[in-house]
């Protein structure tokens, strides 16, 4: 019996989660972010920076209600009040990984960038989408005036009517993940008062931590309606093996 339990525990522990997950803590609450495997360069870069503690104590330095909240500028960690931010980051860019069908619906995370023809992303700056819901008439108007006649897909129209988001960013910026909990945190931060440069008048800081192998597996099991893995052997293997994992 003991041997059977041991072998079963070994087999289940050998399983890997399907995605990387990040816990984002803010003064307005906690959110859990899932990183997309369809955008591996952005996924791996964000995973690396979170693991290094890069984002801890940085500000959401640009906040626009019904649009997005932006952070990831390392210059924001010790920035004085009212100082303009948004130009800091690592000395590299990430090649664009813009995917058809991965769109700017509410709760997604996108990579910020400067104006460059290759649409390369900032090495660290990101935004969480709030956006808003649209009507058919509103989307028709967007197609005509903002998108210069480009037609939205059925998926885009349905998503932006039912969930909301920022459709005019589609195809221009890389979306590389989504919040699976804590979307209300985005709404709360997006509602704060800001200055003329869209910087919050009261600093909104962040801290990030990767979910462990066990936390990620249990999160995915819960999404499938399964019981979380627990018990003596699970705790034993967690203590003997690195809690981190690689995809």
Question: What residue ranges belong to the model's regions?
Answer:
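Cyclophilin-like peptidyl-prolyl cis-trans isomerases
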Residues: 12-247
